[in-house]
């Protein structure tokens, strides 16, 4: 039986932590673990997922939940309640439903105070890791038999009916992820016609029917070249000389978005080396299986710009293709020959210096899973027996996650992000005495997860921003500051500081709060919006150089509605509790941030959500930020338009249901199913409550709350539905904790702000 381990790790030469591994999540397989009942539940969960895999694509994340609830002997003692047709919701019924949700969710808290959860969904995360382990000869040690079994389960569970795999678990089939998944199955031991339901044969047919892997996007061309089933001359150049350009140039790496920078850093190293893994019998077989013509007859130069239409979200502009062609025809031939190859060697040396710096400052977690595998492979190419690679191996378990649909690779974990919202949801329930231990542990986790130092050495010279006082998306070891993660954690610390110490623990020291405020203030742009990781400000025209085909807006850092709104709320609360600290700066910050939210509102009254689906998510954040800054339905046209949008999109069952297609299409798309999405319903409900809807017409709120109450399960859980997270416009991300956090929070705000005033009258 698989078991989730929390905050475990032994300090040694290859594994170390800045805060004793608080927040770390790792899975271990115990062949003798679990009771007969627990094993039966897990098998039932696996079978149910398989049977419904085309209806509900995200997992319900049940394995660790079964484990935790069993360890705590949790039993829901409060009977379920339902609101009948035509019946009004009483304060008592809302309290019972909320109490049940709070009881259940509190039981899911880990020993270190955070809430574990899957944070995955993209189907290009895991295969490169498997490929990397195959190339380096560590496949069987990193992925023993039970790991391989669960990886294959995941691949089978998310194969589309047409035989392919999407960019993410809810997406249409793409060449990129179909080819990667096929290769992954073959590496893990499946034959050309093997796999459950003829998985390999169906996948290969899809690939060949759609033009073969010559039509794979650029990232796929890179990985296949590394593996040896594609040729580097069929890829666009990624010159490592980029890292030794003068800093005044507009295309300097310091001006790039951190994730773009961190992907192309190791990619350019591997490209500069023209590294190719061992050509094994399997690689030779793949060369035959993945193409519609003999491998040695392919004109590689002609396939550089070829991309399957199923993968193409961002068509490259002509200026970009001209740039690649210039580098390919003119620059690369020079840089690979004497004496210019000396410049190439210098560039490779500098690039590797940056890779090591980033690895060390993230404790070898790196900024994310795509970057992790590339940096790890680059370290192996530099020195297969070196300590750098061994340190990378020690952090692979941090990325692996097991659920009823198998083993997948996480983005890098959402521990801090989820916990920040979880604490706010629980505080809104006003059941503080009953859940004091839960709040105290959550408070401790947040305090222990704050980043306490800037990156090491001359961090600005390594293109890094301040991080002292920030919070990351995951844990302290990760090290990368994020504005909204910082703002949400800061809100928690401020709210908890107003409560009795004996109830929730020692308040965070003011100096550490000041450090957090400093980070948030530093990330505001001239237009008033907040960037996420680093200050924005590079020229927008650089997006014309976006080298990917399936993402948008990845070259430079941008401002985001959610980051801006979270930061407004945090600083308004901070100003109230610490009125003497940087007051003038904070006032200016809030005014400019409000103007940004007003400026980016869509014509239909909504706001585009960059990290959740989509206009519902963005509108909840924006309304919360505007109201916190003193805007209201009466004095703000933006608030009125936002409210009208939410009311207009409410469905007949009282909920909201927005399709993930809204994100790439940038237009509101309703779910095609009749059932509303409970997470989105909670977002919209809270957005309307922020705006004072209860005073105008509470009926839409009652209808939404009724849906949440009636959808609650027997144990106090809520059902898993459609995926609700997103990044880079076109790729969805499964936040498994959202189905608990937001319905609970929505009911808490409803009970506190809608029902209580009515009862007091």
Curated annotation (Swiss-Prot):
Please report which protein family the annotation says this sequence is part of.
Answer: Belongs to the terpene cyclase/mutase family.
Q: Which reaction does it catalyse?
A: (S)-2,3-epoxysqualene = beta-amyrin
Enumerate the Pfam families for this protein: SQHop_cyclase_C (PF13243), SQHop_cyclase_N (PF13249)
| Residues forming the catalytic site | 484 (proton donor)
Q: Gene3D superfamilies recorded for this chain?
A: 1.50.10.20
Q: Which gene specifies this protein's sequence?
A: TTS1
Q: Which CDD domains does the UniProt entry name for this protein?
A: SQCY_1 (cd02892)
Known role:
Oxidosqualene cyclase converting oxidosqualene into beta-amyrin, generating five rings and eight asymmetric centers in a single transformation.
Task: Indicate whether Electron transport appears among the record's keywords.
Answer: no
Note the segments forming the PFTB repeats. 148-189, 513-558, 590-630, 639-680, 701-742
Enzyme Commission number:
5.4.99.39
List the GO cellular component terms: lipid droplet
Task: Give this protein's Gene Ontology molecular function annotations.
Answer: beta-amyrin synthase activity
Q: What NCBIfam families does the record point to?
A: squalene_cyclas
Q: In which tissues is it expressed?
A: Expressed in the leaves and in the epidermal cells but not in the inner tissues of the fruit.
Q: Give the protein's recorded name.
A: Beta-amyrin synthase
Q: What's an example Gene Ontology biological process for this entry?
A: triterpenoid biosynthetic process
Organism, by scientific name, is Solanum lycopersicum
Query: Keyword set for this entry?
Result: Isomerase, Repeat
Q: Name the top EC class.
A: isomerase
């Amino acid at each position: 039986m698989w078991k989730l381990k929390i905050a475990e790790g032994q300090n040694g030469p290859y594994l170390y932590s800045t805060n004793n591994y608080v927040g770390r999540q790792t899975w271990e397989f115990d062949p003798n673990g679990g009771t007969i009942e627990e094993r039966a539940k897990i098998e039932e969960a696996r079978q149910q997922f398989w049977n419904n895999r085309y209806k509900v694509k995200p997992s319900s994340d049940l394995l660790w939940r079964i484990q935790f609830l069993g360890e705590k002997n949790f039993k829901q003692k409060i009977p379920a309640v339902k609101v009948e047709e035509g019946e009004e919701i009483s304060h008592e019924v809302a309290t019972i439903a909320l109490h049940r949700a709070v009881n259940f969710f509190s039981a899911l808290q880990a020993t270190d105070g955070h809430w574990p959860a899957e944070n995955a969904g993209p189907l290009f995360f895991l295969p490169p890791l498997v490929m990397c382990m195959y190339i380096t000869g560590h496949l069987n040690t990193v992925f023993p038999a039970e790991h391989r079994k669960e990886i294959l389960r995941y691949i089978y569970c998310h194969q589309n009916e047409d035989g392919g795999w999407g960019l993410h678990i809810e997406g249409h089939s793409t060449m990129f992820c179909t080819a990667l998944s096929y290769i992954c199955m073959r590496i893990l031991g499946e034959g050309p016609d093997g796999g459950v339901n003829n998985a390999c044969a169906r996948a290969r047919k899809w690939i060949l029917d759609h033009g073969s892997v010559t039509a794979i996007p650029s990232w796929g061309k890179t990985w296949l070249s590394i593996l040896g089933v594609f040729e580097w001359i069929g890829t666009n150049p990624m010159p490592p000389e980029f890292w030794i350009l003068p800093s005044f140039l507009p295309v300097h790496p310091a001006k790039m978005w951190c994730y773009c920078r961190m992907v192309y850093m190791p990619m350019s190293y591997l490209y500069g080396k023209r590294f190719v893994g061992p050509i094994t019998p399997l690689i030779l077989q793949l060369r035959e299986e993945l193409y519609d013509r003999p491998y040695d007859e392919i004109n590689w130069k002609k396939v550089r710009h070829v991309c399957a239409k199923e993968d193409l979200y961002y068509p490259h502009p002509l200026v970009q293709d001209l740039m690649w062609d210039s580098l390919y025809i003119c620059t690369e031939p020079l840089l690979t020959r004497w004496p210019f190859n000396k410049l190439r060697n210098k560039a490779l040396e500098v690039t590797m210096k940056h890779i090591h710096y980033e690895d060390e400052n993230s404790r070898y977690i790196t900024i994310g899973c795509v970057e992790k595998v590339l940096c790890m492979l680059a370290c192996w190419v530099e020195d297969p027996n070196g300590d750098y690679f061994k340190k990378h191996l020690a952090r692979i378990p941090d990325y692996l996650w097991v659920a009823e649909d198998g083993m997948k690779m996480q983005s890098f974990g959402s521990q801090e992000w989820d916990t920040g919202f979880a604490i706010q949801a629980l505080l809104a329930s006003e059941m503080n005495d009953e859940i004091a231990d839960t709040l105290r542990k959550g408070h401790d986790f947040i305090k222990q997860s704050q980043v306490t130092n800037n990156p090491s050495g001359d961090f600005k010279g390594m293109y890094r921003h301040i991080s002292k006082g920030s919070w990351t998306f995951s844990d302290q070891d990760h090290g990368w500051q994020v504005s909204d993660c910082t703002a949400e954690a800061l809100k928690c610390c401020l709210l908890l500081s107003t409560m009795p110490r004996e109830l929730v623990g020692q308040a965070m020291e003011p100096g550490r709060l000041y450090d957090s405020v400093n980070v948030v203030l530093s990330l505001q742009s001239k237009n008033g919006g907040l960037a996420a990781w680093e200050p924005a400000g590079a020229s927008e025209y650089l997006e014309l150089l976006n080298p990917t085909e399936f993402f948008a807006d990845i070259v430079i850092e941008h401002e985001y509605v959610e980051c801006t709104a979270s930061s407004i709320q945090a600083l308004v609360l901070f100003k109230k509790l610490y009125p003497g600290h940087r007051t003038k700066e904070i006032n200016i910050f809030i005014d400019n941030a409000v103007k940004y939210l007003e400026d980016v509102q869509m014509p239909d009254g909504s706001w585009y959500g960059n990290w959740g689906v989509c206009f519902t998510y963005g509108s909840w954040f924006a309304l919360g930020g505007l109201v916190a800054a003193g805007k209201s339905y009466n004095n703000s046209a933006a608030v009125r338009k936002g409210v009208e949008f939410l009311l207009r999109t409410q469905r007949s069952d009282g909920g909201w249901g927005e399709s993930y297609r809204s994100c790439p299409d940038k237009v509101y798309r309703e779910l095609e199913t009749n059932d509303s999405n409970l997470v989105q319903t909670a977002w919209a409900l809270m957005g309307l409550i922020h705006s004072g809807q209860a005073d105008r017409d509470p009926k839409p709120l009652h209808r939404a709350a009724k849906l949440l109450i009636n959808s609650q399960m027997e144990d106090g859980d809520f059902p898993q539905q459609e995926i609700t997270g997103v990044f880079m416009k076109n790729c969805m991300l499964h936040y498994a904790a959202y189905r608990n956090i937001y319905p609970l929070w929505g009911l808490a705000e409803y009970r506190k702000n809608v029902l209580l005033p009515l009862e007091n009258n």
